[in-house]
């Protein structure tokens, strides 16, 4: 059934929709399936299925219902682009406080429409939230400024937080795990659980928490510097998340502000993120996105992009989210990952299709991880344009030839190299840990700095 007369209005202007402030706007790349309707007809059916309609006209529809239809307002068939305006009245709100929820946003904008028989594929690439709806989201309660404050740094441009992920990701018992933390903390700032680490039979959660607390205290005594740890509290059960978080805070006592809470936000979903955000508003909320590539990968033509995921994370209240390495690490990514980092940190930012005004909502920190080491960092910082972020290098720290502490120092020296605008190989001559990174990661060194062996007078590794 052609529903374009009801669910498409190509005379609507985007500027008018934004000025009106009553619609969420979404941009999709969409292709109709062969043998079904044309582009506009398929887009209209998509809008119907995403809002007030179905595949037929139903007798219960009234004038009010038609007033909250989602409308296709722009198409470009050559670019496979369609834009849809969703009235904000369509979105579910909490009974307890009237707040908005990402679960409802996803259900409408990227729900049943992903399985429509007449759609070959459809992927959301950007969305716009009007002020009236944006104010209903929690947003972050803590930011990187809170971590800088704990570390004793300026709260403006406090700089690079040098972090790691204890490797191997599974298989360490509590004391060896804590020993690795201590080693890294002698040179670094921040350690996070890897996403599957929790309460394995060989590493009971409470034993690990106590061991890490002891390691943090010893490292702080040894260095005279504060340290940070991000604990995974992800669980299927809301009460399990609360129990984990409360035990951590009780154990760390006066160092509770040195602890972040990590949630696997993609696999556990918006409910888990909101549980952490609301139950523990004083803690830095670390959004890990494990599994997201199933829908966000450039190879996937359905779902939504990593940019969209990052934007949703800020609305939900993530203090920080992993945003990729912009093509500098081992994980799939592109230089355009920079757009995600920019969108979640600025108060006004241009996306691929929409400019978003955040109205003072706290920023979300870009967290960088996945195959990074000191040799890759100067180019990464140059691409991003600043170093106000958290970087968690697992192999990049513990793969250093002189161990985790030296690996941490090499990462910190990489930031210094970039800030000074120095040639990395020349800089290495006076910075031992950075120089030893060339020997630790010779394949990267050969690729990025072909003459390093002669310049540093080092033998082939």
Curated annotation (Swiss-Prot):
Site description Transition state stabilizer, residues in chain: 330
Keyword vocabulary terms for this entry: Calvin cycle, Carbon dioxide fixation, Lyase, Magnesium, Metal-binding, Monooxygenase, Oxidoreductase, Photosynthesis
Active site per the UniProt annotation: 167 (proton acceptor), 288 (proton acceptor)
Tree of life domain: Bacteria
EC id: 4.1.1.39
HAMAP family xref list: RuBisCO_L_type2
Function description: RuBisCO catalyzes two reactions: the carboxylation of D-ribulose 1,5-bisphosphate, the primary event in carbon dioxide fixation, as well as the oxidative fragmentation of the pentose substrate. Both reactions occur simultaneously and in competition at the same active site.
Misc note: The basic functional RuBisCO is composed of a large chain homodimer in a 'head-to-tail' conformation. In contrast to form I RuBisCO, the form II RuBisCO are composed solely of large subunits.
Protein name: Ribulose bisphosphate carboxylase
Source organism: Rhodopseudomonas palustris (strain BisB5)
């Amino acid at each position: 059934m052609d529903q374009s007369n009801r669910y498409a209005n190509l005379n609507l202007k985007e500027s008018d929709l934004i000025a009106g402030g009553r619609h969420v706007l979404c941009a999709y790349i969409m292709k109709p399936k062969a043998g079904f309707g044309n582009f506009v007809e398929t887009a209209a059916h998509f809008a119907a299925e995403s809002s007030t309609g179905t595949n037929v006209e139903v007798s219960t529809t009234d004038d009010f219902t038609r007033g909250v239809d989602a409308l296709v307002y722009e198409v470009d068939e050559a670019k496979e682009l369609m834009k849809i305006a969703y009235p904000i009245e369509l979105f579910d709100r909490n009974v307890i406080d009237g707040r908005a929820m990402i679960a409802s946003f996803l259900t409408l904008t990227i729900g049943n429409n992903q399985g429509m028989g007449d759609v070959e594929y459809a992927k959301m690439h950007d969305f716009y939230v009007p002020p009236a709806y944006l104010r209903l989201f929690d947003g972050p309660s803590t930011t990187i400024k809170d971590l800088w404050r704990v570390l004793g740094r300026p709260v403006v441009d406090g700089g690079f937080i040098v972090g790691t992920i204890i490797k191997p990701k599974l298989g360490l018992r509590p004391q060896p795990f804590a020993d690795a933390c201590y080693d890294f903390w002698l040179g670094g700032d921040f350690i996070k659980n890897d996403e599957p680490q929790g309460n394995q039979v060989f590493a009971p959660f409470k034993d690990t928490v106590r061991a890490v607390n002891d390691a943090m205290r010893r490292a702080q005594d040894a260095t005279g510097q504060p340290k940070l740890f991000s604990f995974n509290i992800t669980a299927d059960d809301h009460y399990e998340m609360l129990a984990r978080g409360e035990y951590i805070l009780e154990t760390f006592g006066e160092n509770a502000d040195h602890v972040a809470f990590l949630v696997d936000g993609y696999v556990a979903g918006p409910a888990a993120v909101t549980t952490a955000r609301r139950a523990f508003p004083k803690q830095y909320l670390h959004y890990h996105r494990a599994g997201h590539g199933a829908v966000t990968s450039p190879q996937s033509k359905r779902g939504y992009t990593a940019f969209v995921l990052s934007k949703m994370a800020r609305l939900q209240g993530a203090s920080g989210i992993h945003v990729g390495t912009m093509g500098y690490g081992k994980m799939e990514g592109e230089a355009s990952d920079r757009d995600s980092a920019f969108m979640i940190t600025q108060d006004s930012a241009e996306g691929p299709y929409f400019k978003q005004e955040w109205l003072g909502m706290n920023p979300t920190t870009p967290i960088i991880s996945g195959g990074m080491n000191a040799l890759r960092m100067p180019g990464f910082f140059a691409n991003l344009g600043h170093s106000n972020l958290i970087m968690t290098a697992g192999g990049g720290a513990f793969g250093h030839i002189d161990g985790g502490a030296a690996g941490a120092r090499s990462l910190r020296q990489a930031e210094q190299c970039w800030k000074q605008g120095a040639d990395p190989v020349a800089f290495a001559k006076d910075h031992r840990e950075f120089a030893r990174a060339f020997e630790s990661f010779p394949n990267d060194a050969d690729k990025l700095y072909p003459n390093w062996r002669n310049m540093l007078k080092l033998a082939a590794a």
